[in-house]
Amino acid sequence: KQELAWGSHMLLTATPAASVLVLWRQEVLLRRGLISQEPFNPGAITLRAMEREQTISLVNTSLFPGRAEFDAMLQALPAVLVCPLGQQGAVIVGGWSPRCFSRSDERWLEGWSQRLRTSLEVGEVHPHPSDSA
């Protein structure tokens, strides 16, 4: 839980992130920031990131037909980063404006996601759904 709290807090305060969602084994572990309470179901973009184990950056969601996948986080997010936790989950970060995330924001998210994945795999982070904070 501390890992989820610390990492999501840092993303929301040190990057242009407006919302953070952590998905692990088909369960939403964390919703934080400006976020709706609609059920989140991973769509084609999230599943592709998990399958390929590569971060997907939607710098301007208005240009992507699959953007509705993220409306369950927050309607009309202008930018989205989907960072896989292997093939079992993902950290999804919504940004305040189009093209708001820098390369260093993306690298920081990838580093934290690797650390979070390791913690989840060894059971240090217990998967209990969390309300937004």
Write out the residue ranges for each language-model feature:
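Intrinsically disordered, low-complexity terminal regulatory regions
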Residues: 1-30, 122, 126-127, 131-133
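Short amphipathic alpha-helical segments
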Residues: 3, 7, 41, 104-108, ...
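Short acidic, glycine/proline-enriched loop segments that cap or flank alpha-helices
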Residues: 4, 69, 99-100
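Regulatory sensory and allosteric helical modules in signal-transduction proteins
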Residues: 24-78
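Short hydrophobic beta-strand micro-motif common in sensory/regulatory domains
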Residues: 76-86
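Juxtadomain coupling helices with adjacent low-complexity linkers
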Residues: 91-133
